[in-house]
Each structure stands twice: as structure tokens, then as C-alpha cells.
UniProtKB/Swiss-Prot annotation:
The Q motif is unique to and characteristic of the DEAD box family of RNA helicases and controls ATP binding and hydrolysis. Residues 77-247 form the Helicase ATP-binding domain. This is ATP-dependent RNA helicase DHH1. A motif (DEAD box) lies at residues 195-198. It comes from Saccharomyces cerevisiae (strain ATCC 204508 / S288c).
Length: 506
């Protein structure tokens, strides 16, 4: 009898040791020591363990570098786990994606081989990023996630759906197509999530979303997340959500860590001004926004002519090309990305510390989403707006609507406003998997070549003149992105298009 008790006590002690030591065996990344603002620090003091999440999920959370929940995660995760509908409003870059991914992974049953959660996003890039967050946080959970977007092979999606898929991440058009063909069975999908809900319920997508909902069970749970809530979102809430729990963390609309400036310049002097900014600012990575796809390509060509590394991305590019640009910019292989508003929604690249509006946006909503690409997760960032005479009324209107102040740019910008003291702590984004779960590898000869990305020679354009004295100005200061963290030194030969080498496919 004594030996039995001894054995029981020994086993009990060993189990206790295992419970105590499971964290020590995790592969936790280096701590991000950059200063943060109250956007993510103003919490109630809860930890992820306080939510009683399954251990496999906690392992993925900690191995992704998460330490404590942000305010939106603290509010949304426990309520979502109870099964209640949620309407959540929080700033860009405060952890909204994890706020719905974590309860989704907690609620999905790995042994039930059905689609149990549908995550809808407005853009292909955001779908790729969200699916990767699902896979990263849920890597120990035995849960299968599939991403499906327009512009990819429909046959591959159909083949993938013949296998087990627990979580489906996609854009509305492709999801509706698969559901209408009865390829994607949503009859057991008990969780419906919309990220960037304001965009999802705009005229572009509202009808499609309504059709998709008809394929879900009537008792499904709905989670809606966004930074802005126009009237269309409220109408959708009244029609489709059952006694939703409303979260509003928007005391102010802009992130506290972003310092905003404007520079008043003539249109023909914008490139000269941009060149000056490049030489004076300590840029880790920068995103430059234009208002049209033609100006995106033209500006990328002009920046390249000045001797700076530069990629571009816009909606008229092939999906495979956009994927390559997005992947390489996330991995720090180039400092500067010129793009249209394609990348204003939800894209999370924490190494971006400067956003430049080469063309000033027309609406406060667009402005808010653009500048939110810097200062991610409570860190510091810089937003610089190049303003001409015709933009002055929009500048005033946006300041009034957002309740923010955009100051005139000073002669010297304090580096403490946007530069981390130790760039080695800047986290490298989750690596996008070399091949998505539902697409076959593309042979080497089918990859887009450098010529496919090339910009046709441009004639003299009076809007983008650069004084001869500035043509040979020095490029960025010495690279601050540490190579051991996945940010290689700046290359000697610069291009305005991604290299035509074999690259990972999505």
C-alpha cells in the first residue's frame, strides 16, 4: 500500500514538474524592447493564462513573441470564447488580428473535419497575412487553415477543400464562388469573422457578404472588427448580430506613437522633397502612397533613377507578382515600397517606421489606414504628407474629422520620435510559408521574370522634376536592419522591381 502511495506521489510530482516546466521548453524569440504607447499598454493587467486557453494554443502564442494581451485582446478574447457576438472598434496596429484568431483557435475542434470558422478580409495580401497568423499561433493545435483569394487557381482550391480544412480565410468573391459550387461546405461553420468590417460592408462587398451568410447555420457566432464604423456596419449589426457585445477603444482615432507632419510643396518639386527626406531620415523601412496605379509605377521608376532600392505594388499587377513583392518587403529585402491604397488595410510590418503620402488622400478614412502602417503595436513611427495648393482643404478637413494635428515639418526631425534605440529588437514578421496549403509549387520557368516587372521607359514628366544638383545625392544612412534578424545589408545594385530569381510561392 505504501509503495502504491509512493508511486502515486512520484507521478503526481512529475506531472506538477511538467506543468511548471512547459514554458521553459518553448522556443521564445528575443524580447522586443522598443518603447510602446498606451495604445497597447493601457490594460487591466491580465495574462493569456488568465483566459484559460488550451496549452497548445498558449505554446503558439508565446513562441510568436506575445507576452501580454493588448487592450483589444483583453476585451475581446474572453467574450468571444463564451460564444457571444462582438462588434469591436480599435485602432489599426493594436492587435486586432490576434484578438479574433486566438478565440477562433480555442473554439475549433481538431477532430471535427469540417470548416468551423470563416474569416473574411477585403484584400489578398491581408488574407495571406491573416492565414499565416492562424498557422503561427495554432501550430501546436493540429488545426488546418486554408487561404483562398481571387487571382489564384480555382482548381487548386477545389482539390484542397477535399482535404480537411478547419479554418477558411478568404476574400468575399472567391468564398462565395466556392460555397455556390458546394465545394466549400459551410453548414457546420459556427464562427463568422469580418476583419476591416467597414470595407467589407461597403458597396463593393455588401451584397456578396449577405449571400455568403445564407450558407452558414442560422445560429452562428459573428465577430466584427474595424477601426471605423460607418452607417453600413450599424445596419448590418441590427440585421445579423444577436445582442452583440460592443467594444470601443477609440478615444482618439490616430495611433499615439505616430508623429504627423506636412510639407507644402509644388507638384513639380515633390520628387526633390522626397529625395531630401531620403537623405535626412533614418529609415528602417518606408511605404510611399500614391493615388493612382500609373503614378505608383512612375514614382518607383524615378526613385530607382535616384539610386534607391524600391519595389512597387498595385491592384493591376498579377497576383503572383503582388505576392512576391509583399513577401520580400515583409522579409526586409528592400527598404522602400511604393503602392496604391491596396496595402492600407491591416498589413502588419513592424519594421516600417516611416509612411509618406506622396499624394495626399481625399478622405479621412484613407488617411487613417495609410498612416497606420507605421507605429504598429504601440511603437513609434513617422507620417509625412506632401501637400500642394489643391490639398490644403483636404488637410484641414482630415484634421477636423480625426481630431488630430498635422504639424508643418521642421528642419530637423528628432530621431527619438521614430527610430528604435536598438534595431535588433525589431521583430521579423512571421515567415510566409513557401507554398500555401492549397496551391501546387510553380516551376522555375513559370516564375515572373525581371522583365515582367520592368517599367517601360518614361519620357520627361514635369511633375517629377529633380534639380541636377540633387541627382547624385547620397542614399539612406547606413542600414539599420540587422542581418541576423533577416534584414540583409543594402544591395549595391538597385532595381524598381523584384529580382527574377526563384522565390517562395504562396
Amino acid at each position: 500500500m505504501g509503495s502504491i502511495n509512493n508511486n502515486f506521489n512520484t507521478n503526481n510530482n512529475s506531472n506538477t514538474d511538467l506543468d511548471r516546466d512547459w514554458k521553459t521548453a518553448l522556443n521564445i524569440p528575443k524580447k522586443d524592447t522598443r518603447p510602446q504607447t498606451d495604445d497597447v499598454l493601457n490594460t487591466k493587467g491580465n495574462t493569456f493564462e488568465d483566459f484559460y486557453l488550451k496549452r497548445e494554443l498558449l505554446m503558439g502564442i508565446f513562441e510568436a513573441g506575445f507576452e501580454k494581451p493588448s487592450p483589444i485582446q483583453e476585451e475581446a478574447i474572453p467574450v468571444a470564447i463564451t460564444g457571444r457576438d462582438i462588434l469591436a472598434r480599435a485602432k489599426n496596429g493594436t492587435g486586432k488580428t490576434a484578438a479574433f484568431v486566438i478565440p477562433t483557435l480555442e473554439k475549433v475542434k481538431p477532430k471535427l473535419n469540417k470548416i468551423q470558422a470563416l474569416i473574411m478580409v477585403p484584400t489578398r495580401e491581408l488574407a495571406l497575412q491573416t492565414s499565416q497568423v492562424v498557422r503561427t499561433l495554432g501550430k501546436h493545435c493540429g488545426i488546418s487553415c486554408m487561404v483562398t483569394t481571387g487571382g489564384t487557381n480555382l482548381r487548386d482550391d477545389i482539390l484542397r477543400l477535399n482535404e480537411t480544412v478547419h479554418i477558411l480565410v478568404g476574400t468575399p468573391g472567391r468564398v462565395l464562388d466556392l460555397a455556390s459550387r458546394k465545394v466549400a461546405d459551410l453548414s457546420d461553420c459556427s464562427l463568422f469573422i469580418m476583419d476591416e468590417a467597414d470595407k467589407m460592408l461597403s458597396r463593393d462587398f455588401k451584397t456578396i457578404i449577405e449571400q455568403i451568410l445564407s450558407f452558414l447555420p442560422p445560429t452562428h457566432q459573428s465577430l466584427l472588427f474595424s477601426a471605423t464604423f460607418p452607417l453600413t456596419v450599424k445596419e448590418f449589426m441590427v440585421k445579423h448580430l444577436h445582442k452583440p457585445y460592443e467594444i470601443n477603444l477609440m478615444e482618439e482615432l490616430t495611433l499615439k506613437g505616430i508623429t504627423q507632419y506636412y510639407a507644402f510643396v509644388e507638384e513639380r518639386q515633390k520628387l526633390h522633397c522626397l529625395n531630401t527626406l531620403f537623405s535626412k531620415l533614418q529609415i528602417n523601412q518606408a511605404i510611399i502612397f500614391c493615388n493612382s496605379t500609373n503614378r505608383v509605377e512612375l514614382l518607383a521608376k524615378k526613385i530607382t533613377d535616384l539610386g534607391y532600392s524600391c519595389y512597387y505594388s498595385h491592384a493591376r499587377m498579377k497576383q503572383q507578382e503582388r505576392n512576391k513583392v509583399f513577401h520580400e518587403f515583409r522579409q526586409g529585402k528592400v527598404r522602400t515600397l511604393v503602392c496604391s491604397d491596396l496595402l492600407t488595410r491591416g498589413i502588419d510590418i513592424q519594421a516600417v517606421n516611416v509612411v509618406i503620402n506622396f499624394d495626399f488622400p481625399k478622405t479621412a478614412e484613407t488617411y487613417l489606414h495609410r498612416i497606420g502602417r507605421s507605429g504598429r503595436f504601440g511603437h513609434l513611427g513617422l507620417a509625412i504628407n506632401l501637400i500642394n495648393w489643391n490639398d490644403r482643404f483636404n488637410l484641414y478637413k482630415i484634421e477636423q474629422e480625426l481630431g488630430t494635428e498635422i504639424a508643418a515639418i521642421p528642419a530637423t526631425i528628432d530621431k527619438s520620435l521614430y527610430v528604435a534605440e536598438n534595431d535588433e529588437t525589431v521583430p521579423v514578421p512571421f515567415p510566409i510559408e513557401q507554398q500555401s496549403y492549397h496551391q501546387q509549387a510553380i516551376p522555375q520557368q513559370q516564375l515572373p521574370s525581371q522583365q515582367q516587372f520592368a517599367i517601360p521607359p518614361q519620357q520627361h514628366h514635369p511633375q517629377f522634376m529633380v534639380p541636377p544638383s540633387h541627382q547624385q545625392q547620397q542614399a539612406y544612412p547606413p542600414p539599420q536592419m540587422p542581418s541576423q534578424q533577416g534584414y540583409p545589408p543594402q544591395q549595391e545594385h538597385f532595381m524598381a522591381m523584384p529580382p527574377g530569381q526563384s522565390q517562395p510561392q504562396y
